[in-house]
Amino acid sequence: MGNTKLANPAPLGLMGFGMTTILLNLHNVGYFALDGIIRAMGIFYGGIAQIFAGLLEYKKGNTFGLTAFTSYGSFWLTLVAILLMPKLGLTDAPNAQFLGVYLGLWGVFTLFMFFGTLKGARVLQFVFFSLTVLFALLAIGNIAGNAAIIHFAGWIGLICGASAIYLAMGEVLNEQFGRTVLPIGESH
């Protein structure tokens, strides 16, 4: 077995993140109920697929990709568990303020990860910046019990998710065609 070039796992992780983020934030802006579609995406595409992408980033020696994808994949799995376990009678419903603290911790983590993007593509920077803002607003909205803030956060989440999908498609198409099809603001 010789040196086999590994495929880029980032588009898989970015799509899992982006699509699941859009679906959850369609709920946050009030378009859809928090139902099985969002939960299933949270488990399988947002959760498991991102963790798989992170493990492939590990194989490539990419600490940032490993940390980002396995962490956010775990975020989706824990969020689904937080929302689903009370419905299964396994625990009480989450306290909104404590959910805000949970989201705030993810915001702090994301802020530090944002600093790790500053040598990367501009679109990646935007994904992490908008995700930091999203987590901050969701944390504040839950802690304060303010539905308007959560609703506004949903719009930020839609933009964040769409930017992650754009980045994923940029990486796929730019590699596939060997040229810039979708500009992602590559660092030089």
Where are these regions (language model features)?
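N-terminal topogenic module of multi-pass integral membrane proteins
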Residues: 1-53, 57
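Extramembrane terminal tails and long inter-domain/linker segments of multi-pass membrane proteins
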Residues: 1-8, 18, 174-188
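Membrane-helix interface "capping/anchor" motifs
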Residues: 7, 56-64, 115-126
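Helix-coil boundary and interhelical linker segments in multi-pass alpha-helical membrane proteins
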Residues: 26-35, 85-97, 143-151
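Membrane-helix exit/interface motif
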Residues: 27, 52-56, 78-90, 109-116
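Helix-adjacent hinge/juxtasegments
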Residues: 66, 70, 74-103
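Alpha-helical membrane segments in multi-pass integral membrane proteins
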Residues: 101-112, 122-143, 149-170
